Amino acid sequence: MSSTAHNSQPSTGNGVTKRKSGSAACIHCHRRKVRCDARIVGLPCSNCRSAGKADCRIHEKKKRLAVRSILDPVPIRCRPPPDSDSTPKLLPSTPIQPNAFTTAFRGVQPDVTSPVAAGAQIIQSPHSSYTNGNHLSNNRGSQPITETQTFTRQPGADRSMELENNADLEKRLVKLIDEEESGSREIQRGVRAIYVGHELSNMSFLIRQQRDKDDDVYHFAGNEIPRRQLRTGHDQLLMDALTLPEPALADELVEAYFMHVNPGYPIIEEDLFMTQYRNRDPADPPPILLLQAILLVGAHVTRPKAERDALKEIFFRRVKWLFDSRIERNRDIMVQAALLMTWHSDSADDDVAANAHYWVGVAARIATGLGMHRNPVSSKFVPRDRRMWRRLWYILVQFDVMVSLSYGRPQAINLEDSDVSPLTPSDFEGCGSRVQAEYVIHFSELCTMIPYIVRERFGLRVSAERRKAALQEADEALANWSLKLPDSLRLRASDMDPWSAMLHLTYNNFLILLHRPHPRASAYSDDYGPHDAEICSAAAGVIASIFEELRLNDRLKFLWYSGVHTLFTAMIQVRVELRFSNPVLAINALRRFDSASYSLRELAEYWSHANTILRLFQDSKRLQEDLRMATSERPRRFSTHDQNKNTTNPSNPHPTPTPNLNSNTTIQSAQTEPRPPYEVPTPESPRMPPTTMSPHQNQPFDSWIPSSHLASVDPIDQPREFLDWRQLFSFTDPDQSVLPVPMEGLPELEDEWRQIYWQETPMSDLLQDGGWMHG
């Protein structure tokens, strides 16, 4: 027996070593898994005495090494509170060291803390008083992080690999298009299947132009599924998920959410939540799942990019863990949290199960499982919950429609199964004084109308006759909706608020999707409307103008996820107009494309999928040529056939004249001034001064649409052929004069416009050189 054993254990007078109470079995009894009485009789135990074993000693459990955390450290650290006298003030050059106020998450380390985000104070407030088990404990996270709790990792190794993977993923469309066999490549195990969407999808639209033989192919083999290791354990995730920022940062983010997001998407009853949040009552705290989700959205609309990305990643990780772990048992709150999580998108790695499309589907499943799609007529239903359900249902419908239009995927909700009564102003009681009730009501009407139009116009089993009639009915319904908008929601020449902007962006995006030519035009040769070119051009102009106004006023950050895809739709239309033989229209398209490009660059600061669209246009060689052609002095011709038709056709009472470029000062300036080689702005490009679509800084949105007096138009009840397409566009001031130049000559170019869309395949070069997988 070792001397250590003798020294560590007291001995009785008869030479039998006594163990302290609570000791475990000896090594032999432990191995044989029999009861050992060493704790009572001492060593050797009775079993060892009987067996004649002299080496009886207590079995010592192997010391478990501390679990090495390889979780990315939270790159944010708190400075000491102002009233702390014990903490010395640090000079700017002094590195911040962990202290009692550092975040509760185990894994913070000074040497890898990002200096950019050092000012963001993600910590557990030591003053929090939440003690509910499902919420926050006041002593959780206020403990100092000691040396034994801090672990090391290879700094930057995982991040470098992640950046390389993301760069490859952004160019995965190049592989899909350039590889001739990609359409027939087997989707094997470990490879992602890419669904390009139905006929309405931008992605499907471009694929059909490029591949005539793949008309019936909607699934393609994508990149290999990346393998990621589990970065943390459950104990650390729990501690992290229950961690809140210090009060100052939390207050700022909560206030930002209720000021900039909840008024237009009243997911949460502001009065009730803020009462819980301000009272800090342990008996009635705000749900931790909801609070973390609000902090996520608040960070999106307030913080600068580097800090915003770090904060959103942290908050999203916490919200998702709480959501998946079913910490919150109230399913209403789970619907609310899922809708709020649509404000965060993971990297380009996944556009199916890690973005708004996924979370809208999750919210829809829970909501329909709860029965939110049915009208709660029971008198026993709590009025507050009845109002909340109705609001949540229609916001869910809005998100579902917008994300479905963005990707060309089926909706998660079938409105044929719903009988929820329309929203009324009384449904917004308790949502705060800033709630935009009129916006939510009219936007819900639009999003309720769109699914029926899509089904009748683009349904797989719809006859050609019904498809043609659906276009007429859709225009009438949309025009009636537009004419009934209140003045507060009509298009304005300036000071466009995010709510009316989102409404008109969605509306004009749908107009383009509804009226642009189908790539397989032979199958739909007789179902075009008589003014499709004007409608698409006007809608694209409105979209570009709205984005410019929001960009100049720093309001792009308030747009929801679908705003990126709306701008993508408009840029496809403007891309076609760049190739018009009419130089006036081509110059106008150049201005709009320039403005839209800068708006897309700004959107890429907030939404990762905007980067891939930006690269799609940036890498196009034919696009650069078209941009140069749009500014050249020589008239461009689409084809000899079209030029002869436009100049010699006797049935055309207004042949398209060849404009004198010198007669227009704007065009003359664009041609005579030296222009540098055009480059679509990218995230890596140097910052440029904001550009506008004309020399006039405050050009009205409606300057791209011929003037009309919309207020005096009666509701539409006449046949389609008598419908004035201008009724599809409503403005605040019906007497406002509108510059008609952009539309001059466009009706005569209707056939050319269609040919550019689906015969010349103007977007095929973008697919060959770009890199985007979203529909």
Curated annotation (Swiss-Prot):
Compositionally skewed regions (Polar residues) per UniProt: 1-15, 126-153
InterPro entries: Amide_Lactam_Regulators, Transcription_factor_dom_fun, Zn2-C6_fun-type_DNA-bd_sf, Zn2Cys6_DnaBD
GO cellular component terms listed in the entry, alphabetical order: nucleus
Compositionally biased region (Basic and acidic residues): 630-644
Keywords recorded for this protein, A-Z: Activator, DNA-binding, Metal-binding, Nucleus, Transcription, Transcription regulation, Zinc
Biased composition regions of type Pro residues, renumbered to the chain: 674-689
Induction record: By omega amino acids.
Role of this protein: Positively regulates the expression of genes involved in the catabolism of certain amides, omega amino acids, and lactams.
Name listed for the protein in its UniProt record: Acetamidase regulatory protein
